[in-house]
Amino acid sequence: MDNYFEYIFSKETCQQILLLEQLYNNPLGLDIDELGDKIDLERRTLRRHLSYINDVANEYVVMSKPIIFQKKKYVFTGSKSEYYALKCNILKPEPLLNLFELFLNSQSVNFIDFCKENFMSESTARRKLKKANILLQSIGMKLTIRKDEIYIIGEERIIRYSLISLFWRVYRGTEWPFENVDEGRVENIVSSIISSGRYISYGKRKHLAFYLATFISRSQSGNVISKALLPEYSSALIANNHYMGELSQLIEQSFKLPQVELEFILLIFYIFPECYEEFHSVDDTLAILKKYSRRSYSSIMNFVAFIKKRHPKWDKDSPSTPFFWPMLISGRLFVDIFKDAYFNSSGVRIFKHAGTDYPRFLPTIRKSILSHEPKLATNTLKSLTLRYGQAYIMEFSPHDFEPKIKILLLTDSAMYIEKIISQRVENLLKYRFNFILEIDRPSSTPDLILETDVIDTKYSDSKRLFINLEVAPKDRENILTACKDILKEKY
């Protein structure tokens, strides 16, 4: 369920969001037919949605007219922050968004009042709840009505993560939806944990603040986390953390929370790699996992062994980036805490993009995980695959898993010209394919030969392209097409 908005928001709202996304991602604009092809809507509906989006922008003073019509194309003229603000204001009137916001501060919501406040009939409201449950039941949650009260049923930790995921995708830091939690106080807590000596983007800090605000809101409304459902190493991890006393004091100055909530908040910082080194060394954390959760420890070390097998010269004790181990450990801790709650809070369809650009990457990692943990639930496996995949690409290219394309460059030019051509070809291909580019003397039969004026008949079965010395735009297009065709033959 890549686009879970479809289960929560109305059809028209989803169309408007998709339309806005298409225009934002195509800065040169799209004509009405191109929009129709991408969104599969007739012209009249598209124009109605475009007009509505501009009306929303005017009403909320996001900007006067974000979508203009020029040179027969519709163009979004706003900035990134204006795009997020506009998207947020399109979504805000949605009834189920309002319902989930009410659950931040309540254990139940009156069904009759909810219908009245959102101008809906009871039958319409029930249909919306039923549709949302198709999504929620996949992670053990459910919206139910008992004695005219709406309840959200499920494990508290899963409910919290689901709310965070939804609110972050809707608000993206443009607004603060937590009416009973002071934004400044939460940001002070975040700043106290994250070292002031390291730059962490506004968005990442805000995302972490959304976690804390959701936890505080739910706890204050009587929806307390169960310590019994936290990972078995939680207490040991927290007890060895020198920040516990400082954090407890800071939070208690502003919020009255049970001890288990303080511990849960501290534990959550571990799922953010940027915060990780503030707490423990890698060795300390691994030692705790090894003692209290052999399964989690083995999962991490098995994946490290998987990397080592693919890259024998790689030194796990001296990775090229300091974030490799934090990314790997935080990924496993995330899965241990939230289990099979797989929601993509970023709004990027990662598995879809990976399947297009490097189709063997995530499936290979998934297979490696399954070889050691064959009974993982589907969503848990999906989440762990993604987290370990993120750690892998901190060190190596995701194209490592794709078939290698052997390219031979043949020219009759001076060596420095030859070098310039090879660099241009490498820059064109390095983020798209797993390839080796050789000049004059190939180590084996090439898949593709790039020639300038040279005619070489030695490799008669290899695909050939004649290119200009400057590697013109048409040459680049032909090279990309040839590489894609070769990959199709290799799969």
Could you tell me what each predicted segment is?
Residues 2-491:
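A cross-family "folded-core" feature that marks the main globular domain of proteins
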